[in-house]
Amino acid sequence: MGKTDYFERKLDDKRRLTIPTELRDELKSGVVITRGFGQYLHMYPKQVWDEMVEPKLDGDILDERIADLNVQFRTGKTEVELDDKQGRVTIEQHLLAYASIDRDIVVVGVGRYWRVMAK
């Protein structure tokens, strides 16, 4: 992960989150945003999603635990591109509603991904 493991932001009127400059290279391959396990979101670099999360979701289709993870992570999952000019990503309204996020947010690094939460 980059140097920044915590930041606070206000979403703009178009639901865009500005990413700190030092994290933008890590997210240039794209961003996957999905529901977390609690009332927050997960934000993954696309490469991390493809290499680490997606393979875990492709387990035994009869394994109830894997099925539950698929429902949790795929419900509302969005893939977005980082805006090159301003370094922003747009968060879909249904994900904001799930996490009870209005405008003020906190983003915390958790290993290779970030938790996005209401402030």
Language model segments and positions:
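Flexible "stalk/tail and boundary" regions
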Residues: 1-9, 13-14, 22-86, 93-119
